[in-house]
């Protein structure tokens, strides 16, 4: 009757065993008290001795069968049966003495039951050599306690026979006084013994047969070996010997000894010797960015160096905008090099600065004026130095000019324009040279584009090796402001140049320049040709550098404005809409008014018509057309809502400020000089091409319209009005009747990078 510690006590299952024990002990006691004294005097004193010894043997076997472990197999742990799949077969066959015996999977105990093993539904355990569950002993009868159960049956049967026999003898001798107490009690004991004698004798005989045949009650009832051969039999004598004389089987389940818990915990719950030996170190940043706290003993701490932990390379110094700009303009007179170069520091870099090379600290070139010449060491040729533009070259980004009230805004802060035409041409050559070094490799011959009929310009400059972006940084700050060469050459405005010059395709050619390939034709119907994006963006420059450029630009522009005697002819061009019948008639025509230029919408032919623009040789007109063509050729287009909002502002009766509607916030209120071109801008990865225009020989407008039928567009409406209503009157513009596209006799060619060519009727 072993019970696991977690099982609940059920009184009902103890009723049979309590009844059996009470009957056994009660009847035997009454027999020994009322019957045995007379038997001892009348028959023999050996009768009480025999019955007493037999009673003790019955009681001992009963106790062993009740409280002994029958041979319970322990259940499998959760991690023990992981190898057995839940889809494993329900049965497995094993060979026992050449005979296959089936083993069944136990879903409760999670293992295959050994042969002759069965799961007891009452005890809920798998018992080895399971015979049956006996309620009279409240225990399973298995391999370990079957011997005691069998002996209990044998001894109980003998004891019951003795009690009934000796009781009957007492009654027969006291038949005259059946009403006496001793005779009545003896008759009651005989009735109890006789009542249980038949089932006990029957059960004992059944188990005698099973023992002699080598079977269990479970095997006999289920008929496992019925009509077959029993592989577990050892013969009659061998089976009896195995049951009665074999050594006791081991116990598989051992309850842990219950020992009192005598553990005293101290408040810190830490061993003091560990605190003395272990000294925690500072938190160290591992290579993967995780913080790891390490501890070492005092002995190892004595051998540590005094240098601090390596937490990565130091961050670059932060320089305020005012100090940085002042150092650029006034170099320190302490050394000769400081007079020729500007101290440049690395701007703050992103979080991955560990994997990006630092900026170069080579010799720098100061800003070169028109009449200054800076001597310097010998330099390499331009073709060799073009190969130094390797990886990690940041692509600067020029921002698009801000639009008007209804227009678009660039997503990045606007970049200020460069100071002079020399700086502008130097920046353009930097863009072209970097694109050529990426595509061509070493000693690549750069073929510039040529603008037919354009006036010659003296603004040609060269880049020294240190003026180009090197492999260790992005486009330097000096390359934006200092296009001059430190290699002993003259400034860009001087005609005497020592080495082979490179002509940018974005500048007007000189009289001695090689001929350029003719521009390719363009058809708006077929769509534009694929163009390569500009390789340069200025969005990687730090805000400190850009702020200093803006500050210097504003100061020099104000000084130039004081010296300038003429007002600005025009501002930045408007934004052209998509090439459709609606948008081909929209162009930006600027006429000079009392306070500045007035923006006017008309056809594309109105752009270059009239005497107000000074003819085809006007460089300001060419710059305006370049900005217009670049705005027409970039994608994505501006929305119609922003264009109509600009038109509504332009249709106002009063004149507008001279700065135009499309100005960046940094340039509002500052009219540009007449001949100073404005730097185009790049936003994100958009490519804007610099387009040069020229005026070829006069051609009939009818031929142009026949070649390009898409220019013949029906009249469209702007803001609900016809194109004629949308334009300003003759009083606001000196164009007069020349605004009609049907009266022009010239064809204007607008060519750009990538083979894009526009023809505009003049």
UniProtKB/Swiss-Prot annotation:
Pfam families: DHHC
Bias type Polar residues, positions: 471-485
Residues carrying Omega-N-methylarginine: 439
UniProt membrane topology term: Multi-pass membrane protein
Domain DHHC: 104-154
Enzyme class of the recorded protein, top EC level: transferase
Region Disordered, annotated ranges: 289-350, 362-423, 436-537, 551-574, 626-684, 707-744
Catalytic reaction list: L-cysteinyl-[protein] + hexadecanoyl-CoA = S-hexadecanoyl-L-cysteinyl-[protein] + CoA
Domain of life: Eukaryota
Catalytic residues identified in the record: 134 (s-palmitoyl cysteine intermediate)
Keywords for the protein's UniProt record, in alphabetical order: Acyltransferase, Golgi apparatus, Lipoprotein, Membrane, Methylation, Mitochondrion, Palmitate, Phosphoprotein, Transferase, Transmembrane, Transmembrane helix
List of residues that carry Phosphoserine: 335, 603, 624, 672, 679, 722, 740
Observed phenotype of the null mutant: Mice have normal brain morphology, but female have strong locomotor deficits in open field, due to a greater fear of new environments.
Skewed-composition ranges (Low complexity): 626-644
One Gene Ontology CC term in the entry: perinuclear region of cytoplasm
Topology Lumenal: residue spans: 35-52, 170-190
Composition bias type Basic and acidic residues, residue spans: 551-562
Annotated GO MF terms: palmitoyltransferase activity; protein-cysteine S-palmitoyltransferase activity
Entry's EC annotation: 2.3.1.225
GO biological process, one term: regulation of postsynapse assembly
Biological role: Palmitoyltransferase that catalyzes the addition of palmitate onto various protein substrates and therefore functions in several unrelated biological processes. Through the palmitoylation of ABCA1 regulates the localization of the transporter to the plasma membrane and thereby regulates its function in cholesterol and phospholipid efflux. Could also pamitoylate the D(2) dopamine receptor DRD2 and regulate its stability and localization to the plasma membrane. Could also play a role in glutamatergic transmission.
Protein's name according to its UniProt entry: Palmitoyltransferase ZDHHC8
Organism listed in the record: Mus musculus (Mouse)
């Amino acid at each position: 009757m072993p019970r696991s510690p977690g099982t609940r006590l059920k009184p009902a299952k103890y009723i049979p065993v309590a009844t059996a024990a009470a009957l056994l002990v009660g009847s035997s006691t009454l027999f020994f008290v009322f019957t045995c004294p007379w038997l001892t005097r009348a028959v023999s004193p050996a009768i009480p001795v025999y019955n007493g010894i037999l009673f003790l043997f019955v009681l001992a076997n009963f106790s062993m069968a009740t409280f002994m472990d029958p041979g319970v197999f322990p259940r499998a742990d959760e991690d023990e049966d992981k190898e057995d799949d839940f889809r494993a077969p329900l049965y497995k066959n094993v060979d026992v003495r050449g005979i296959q015996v089936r083993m069944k999977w136990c879903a409760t105990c999670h293992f295959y039951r050994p042969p002759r093993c069965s799961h007891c539904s009452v005890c809920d355990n798998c018992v080895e050599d399971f015979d049956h569950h006996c309620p009279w002993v409240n225990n399973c009868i298995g391999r370990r306690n079957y011997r005691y159960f069998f002996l209990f049956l044998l001894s109980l049967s003998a004891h019951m026979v003795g009690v009934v026999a000796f009781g009957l003898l007492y009654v027969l001798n006291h038949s005259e006084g059946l009403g006496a107490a001793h005779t009545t009690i003896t008759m009651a004991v005989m009735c109890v013994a006789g009542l249980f004698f038949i089932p006990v004798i029957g059960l004992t005989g059944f188990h005698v047969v099973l023992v002699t045949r080598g079977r269990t009650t479970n095997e006999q009832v289920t008929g496992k070996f019925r009509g077959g051969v029993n592989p577990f039999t050892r013969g009659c004598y061998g089976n009896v010997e195995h049951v009665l004389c074999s050594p006791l089987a081991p116990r598989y389940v051992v309850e842990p000894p219950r020992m009192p818990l005598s553990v005293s915990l101290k408040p810190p719950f830490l061993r003091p010797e560990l605190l003395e030996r272990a000294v925690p170190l500072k938190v160290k940043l591992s290579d993967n960015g995780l913080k790891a706290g390490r501890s070492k003993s005092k002995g190892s701490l004595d051998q540590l160096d005094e240098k601090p932990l390596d937490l990565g390379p130091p961050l670059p110094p932060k320089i305020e905008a005012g100090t940085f700009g002042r150092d650029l303009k006034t170099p320190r007179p302490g050394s000769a090099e400081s007079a020729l170069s500007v101290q440049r520091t690395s701007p703050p870099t992103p979080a991955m600065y560990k994997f990006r090379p630092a900026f170069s600290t080579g010799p720098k070139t100061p800003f070169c004026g028109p009449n200054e010449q800076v001597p310097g060491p010998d330099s390499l040729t331009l073709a060799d130095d073009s190969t130094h533009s390797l990886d990690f070259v940041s692509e600067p980004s020029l921002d698009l000019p801000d639009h008007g009230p209804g227009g678009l805004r660039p997503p990045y802060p606007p970049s200020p324009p460069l100071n002079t035409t020399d700086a502008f041409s130097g920046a353009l050559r930097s863009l072209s040279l970097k694109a050529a070094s990426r595509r061509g490799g070493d000693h690549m011959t750069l073929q510039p584009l040529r603008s037919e009929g354009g006036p010659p310009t003296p603004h040609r400059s060269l880049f020294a090796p240190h003026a180009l972006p090197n492999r260790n940084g992005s486009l330097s700050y000096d390359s934006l402001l200092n296009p001059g060469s430190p290699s002993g050459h003259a400034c860009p405005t001087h005609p005497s140049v020592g080495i082979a010059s490179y002509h940018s395709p974005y500048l007007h050619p000189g009289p001695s320049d090689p001929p350029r390939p003719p521009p390719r034709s363009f058809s708006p119907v077929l769509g534009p040709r694929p163009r390569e994006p500009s390789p340069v963006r200025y969005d990687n420059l730090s805000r400190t550098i850009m702020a200093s450029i803006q500050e210097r630009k504003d100061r020099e522009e104000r000084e130039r404005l004081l010296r300038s005697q003429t007002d600005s002819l025009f501002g930045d061009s408007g934004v052209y809409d998509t090439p459709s019948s609606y948008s081909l008639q929209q162009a930006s025509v600027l006429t000079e008014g009392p306070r500045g230029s007035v923006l006017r919408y008309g056809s594309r032919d109105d752009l270059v018509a009239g005497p107000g623009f000074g003819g085809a040789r006007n460089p300001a007109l060419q710059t305006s057309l370049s900005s217009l063509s670049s705005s027409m050729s970039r994608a994505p287009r501006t929305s119609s809502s922003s264009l109509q909002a600009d038109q509504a502002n332009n249709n106002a009766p009063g004149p507008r400020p001279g700065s135009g509607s499309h100005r960046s916030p940094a340039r509002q209120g500052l009219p540009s000089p007449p001949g100073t071109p404005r730097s185009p801008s790049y936003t994100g990865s958009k490519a804007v091409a610099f387009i040069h225009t020229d005026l070829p020989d006069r051609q009939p407008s009818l031929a142009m319209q026949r070649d390009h039928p898409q220019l013949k567009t029906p009249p469209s409406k702007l803001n609900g009005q016809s194109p004629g209503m949308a334009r300003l009157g003759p009083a606001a513009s000196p164009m007069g009747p020349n605004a009609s596209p049907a009266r022009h006799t010239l064809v204007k060619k607008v060519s750009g990078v990538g083979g894009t060519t526009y023809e505009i009727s003049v």
